[in-house]
């Protein structure tokens, strides 16, 4: 250690750090809180990081103490190593001195030789964190240290490999380090006599991040190809060699799994480089998959043989785990090939064999069956979404889904071939009295489900009648509940088909109803509920005899479901709520006749599961379905509103758990209520909301209250305004202006749909508000101060966007005469917050409205040269073209500078970017590396996937309302139809404007390219 840190004071500080580290290991919350405060103070000590490094290296200390020391050192490095970030500098104050940094950099590499793998891995991560800012200019010797470690013992090799896995390369480093590191990695991997499996595995793990860096950083295709070819030419032969070796001491499942992971990465990210090797890789992988299938069935599926695989203390030492991981990785590899246009053709001719072997792997294992018998929740979770654990069965299902997605109807004939072979085997096993004969039948039905859409479309050659006959004949095997349950559910999925006559349908429904009996296995009872859901979903639009028959059975199913409720937990209850929702939606008369049973159950589940969002969502759906039945709405309000009002009146700790949920439920009820509002809503629920929101300190309650009030205003604004002789407006203003928009409150009070709420108030109650409009908008501006949450900023900006579209002159006057928080015109303040974030806004409605508003504002400003707009400026951070220094993280902040431009120029730049966003949203997804060299002409291709954050919001329940609002806005503007087309016309027209040259000179090269090549070529 450096002499400057060695003194009595230093020893006492070091001892204090050790004591606080020991306190951090305490389970006492109070001790932990006090320790965190003292640690914060110790971080300002000059030698803090150095002392931590020494503690880490001292093997005399207990392992937990050393581990917590590494955690604290990494945090210290992240917060105190550089001061490029102004926010970080203000938050963390003192930065590490250069002397302390040098000392830490000298000490840490010793940890790469530590005999404990956890210490090595953690030290390696900290070294990588430091290297991200210090290598190479402040730590040039790091690479020599790593190379030395690679030539050392197995501990140091593992440590060096961990550093390389976490390392962040730049272009120069990948070119300099690659040629040195790769030969070392190859040497270690190929030295099976000298190094353990674990060490060789750590060498293989370097390849994925290295390939990813080459793909991202080496943009010259020829240079990239040369580098990749030189690596793969050496490596691929050895990778295939060790993958194909017979199982034994020198070839573990762990090593094979890592090899397959490398292949999978190449298929996913760089398929053209693995393509030349696929003719050799695929037979090896196929042989491996088929060879281990027999062992998997005997050991895992049926447990007819004791596992020959050794268990271990750690996951990497457990061969049983590694065996399953290998199967999962092979299936993922195949899945990636199926979704890669360039490589998919390589398995097109073996689809029947692939489907056949995949069905083998999706059989139910004995372990999973035991879990299902012990825990109904596990059964529901696994069958609904595959559960949270990645299993062989789940991965096999994914392969079948990929075959369906990519080959469509072309996969049906291979599917039938595979099914025929399996059905023959199952019949033989059944004849031989094999107790597990049914598992392959259940797996076959599971497999066919992946192709259900193609089969139901009727465009394939699938023999549905024969298949349904086979499935129907399985219903007699009540001794196998999972088989019968799967058969029932399968029959429900295809029940829309004309193949179902009344007799057949009655028989299946009766078996399903019987399966709900209390004496049946819970697997069968739950399967019966899923079957009912399947029938109702498949036939929701059907009329005639089928519907009549289904409706006649609903009371019996309701009794069966109600009998299943006692003792059921979250996942099962959610399924039951879902079934009741389908039933209510299916028939209005049944809904009215049954609401006396269903509504109390919904209330009970709501009260019991307030902290389970999934169960609550299903309850909300059920309430929504009841609300949409006019006959049920009155009784529902009568029973539910007193409960909700009671919850809203709670005080203290008991209130916070349920009030936001109660407000959500009330919001659902109000939303589907037709005007006028009845007394229970207006005289009881409405004041309860106001009182609750005004007296809570829970942000979630405030937000939910705001949403609920928006529904009240939407349904009957006149009643709200006239409530108690005008007190309704005061109540609304009090909640919105003094609670939700109060700048003294957390920004999260506006985290809901505050923008829509304010817009609703102005549009629905505008003529009755008077001076309250100005007060409302001033509150919006005040709330915009010092915000960090993008959603909140976006919601507040949305208010002004809406007003620019509907009341341009009025809002310009307001923003030009009202001062912003810092004394500048409010227009300057609003546009600064808006324009700096527009390209990050999400949500289809929000993005379109704000873009349309900017178009209108820009057109108005250019046409009128109104000084209320032309005097507004915008500060923008741009790259300094005169700075030619090599870019690293530590110097990146100094290569940019601030420039001031007119706000109208910034609006123009933003609109160019928005055009690109909407245009790309319209077009197909850009070709990836896997697609650029041609597609399979006969493949259906990948289904559309979300491309932007906004796409993830498409299922939001506000969509219908959003679309209505959007259409109303479009009527008030000149923008009709597709927004991308409108932007294209707008930008093209502006290029002919006399002011265009002035704006053009402010554009970057990228913006000019978009404008001139993409817009004008249209």
Curated annotation (Swiss-Prot):
SMART domains: IBN_N
GO cellular component, one term: cytosol
Domain Importin N-terminal residues, every copy: 35-114
Gene Ontology molecular-function annotations: nuclear import signal receptor activity; small GTPase binding
Annotated knockout phenotype: Male and female sterility caused by disruption of chromosome segregation and condensation during meiosis. Impaired nuclear localization of proteasome components. Males form abnormally structured sperm and fail to properly exchange histones for protamines.
Keywords: Cytoplasm, Nucleus, Protein transport, Transport
Gene3D superfamilies: Leucine-rich Repeat Variant
GO biological process: proteasome localization; protein import into nucleus
Localization: Cytoplasm; Nucleus
Coiled-coil regions, chain positions: none
Biased composition (Acidic residues): 926-939
SUPFAM superfamilies: ARM repeat
Record carries keyword Transmembrane helix: no
Alphabetized InterPro entries for the sequence: ARM-like, ARM-type_fold, HEAT_IPO9_central, Importin-beta_N
Domain of life, source organism: Eukaryota
Region spans: Disordered: 921-950
Biological function: Nuclear transport receptor that mediates nuclear import of proteins. Serves as receptor for nuclear localization signals (NLS) in cargo substrates. Is thought to mediate docking of the importin/substrate complex to the nuclear pore complex (NPC) through binding to nucleoporin and the complex is subsequently translocated through the pore by an energy requiring, Ran-dependent mechanism. Mediates the import of pre-assembled proteasomes into the nucleus during the late stages of sperm development.
Family recorded in the similarity comment: Belongs to the importin beta family.
Protein name: Importin-9
Species: Drosophila melanogaster (Fruit fly)
Lineage summary: Eukaryota, Metazoa, Ecdysozoa, Arthropoda, Hexapoda
Gene: Ipo9
